[in-house]
Amino acid sequence: YRKTNHIVDFVDNANIFLNNQIETQLTTGYSKAYGAEFYISKNSGRLTGWISYTFSRARNYIATLGDKEYPPVYDRPHSLKIFLNYEAGRKRRCAFAATFSYNSGMNLTLPIAHYRVNGTAFYIYSTRNGYRAPAFHELNLSMTCKTGKRGRLILSVMNVYNRKNVFTIYTSRDDYDF
């Protein structure tokens, strides 16, 4: 468990675009975080590898927001990493590796509705960081073979099952829908 004082975040409805006084759009508070990490590895034999899992939670508290807790962007409760490596052949000239990663998605604030007054659009947002993006996960495979005394042939396939992981989220608007 850890408490961090003097964290900085934006005020609600911050106006940061082309703002020469950005400091007026910032506020301070504190954060609480806790978690646990587990790790196991196998370092000998033809098959080696490791598994790592982390569970962590964080909550921010900002006085100007009523001291209500909210999850920060970096609150990603689950992180799992698995790495396996197998050395094949009598002389172990080729190695086959697999890496799997899973991470909870990031928190974000999204517009949930909008209305117009005299042609100007106004947005209504979800609670601060009230949505979590989809989880990120991928499987990568590789083969490395020694060729001669110094050469190596490496073949890698990234994101084997072609997961469309979310890197960032953009909202778009039209007159009827988001």
Language-model segments: what does each one mean?
Residues 6, 46, 73, 135, ...:
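Residue-level preference for alpha-helix termini and adjacent loops
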Residues 101-120, 138, 144-178:
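C-terminal beta-signal and adjacent terminal beta-strands/loops
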Residues 10-14, 29-31, 50, 75-77, ...:
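Surface-exposed loop/turn and secondary-structure junction residues enriched for glycine/proline
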Residues 10-24, 65, 112-126, 171-177:
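Solvent-exposed loop segments that connect transmembrane elements
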Residues 26-27, 60, 129, 159-165:
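Asparagine-centered polar/low-complexity signal
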Residues 4-8, 23-25, 133, 157, ...:
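Generic secondary-structure boundary/loop-capping signal
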